[in-house]
């Protein structure tokens, strides 16, 4: 919806080269020119790359698939250098430990912060998402939504969304469990020889020092354990490991350890 509403000029929009996989899909679908900006070797945004003339900026924070968080200082710097275009911060995973950019809405009328119920509230099938921005930008979004919205919500979805917000205790308890498990898994992965950047999401983007990611991905798949492998430049030796229950993660870690020992890598 934001792409349709705000990214309709002749100048290219900017987003990272390693990012949510649908940004380029939407840009191509709506014939929006775009340029990807390379993250640095630690998967951080290089703010200077966004100083150039452009038709808009969008990036996820924390990043998907890396889980790396951009600081609020960096986000504000990008906003200061892009006050004539729309800047969208995609906070799909923000509840898992990252800092929201919402306070910056008071200072920047060109900022849009989007969030979703699909991740931290486990309601992907309900298709509930929302944007927060100045009244003027929300009006423009509504104008397009009432004409072209393909993600309409029925009363059941709306009722479930309200129930999710009302049960804040369960929401916070679930987040705490996921974060706690994530930190435990990170420690064990380090012991097993993996490296990764600090994740502020519900997944870990990890690479092993001697076991190729694709090889481990295929081995885990044989055991009906599914992690995400990206056969793309720069990240083709990483696995995105989503945090499940403690029992699921114990099984995952056990199979990884077993395979590393069998192949003489541990």
Residues of each region from the PLM?
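PLP-dependent enzyme catalytic core of the Aspartate aminotransferase-like
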Residues: 73, 218-223, 228, 232-266
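Short beta->alpha connector loops at strand-helix junctions that form conserved
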Residues: 17, 36-40, 115, 230-231
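Active-site phosphate-binding strand-loop segment of PLP-dependent enzymes
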Residues: 40-95
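PLP-dependent aminotransferase class I/II
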Residues: 110-190, 194-197
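A short helix->loop->beta-strand "cap" motif at the edges of active sites that frequently abuts
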Residues: 11, 32, 82-86
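Phosphate-binding glycine-rich loop
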Residues: 1-12, 210
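Conserved PLP-binding catalytic core of the aspartate aminotransferase-like
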Residues: 179, 191-223, 239
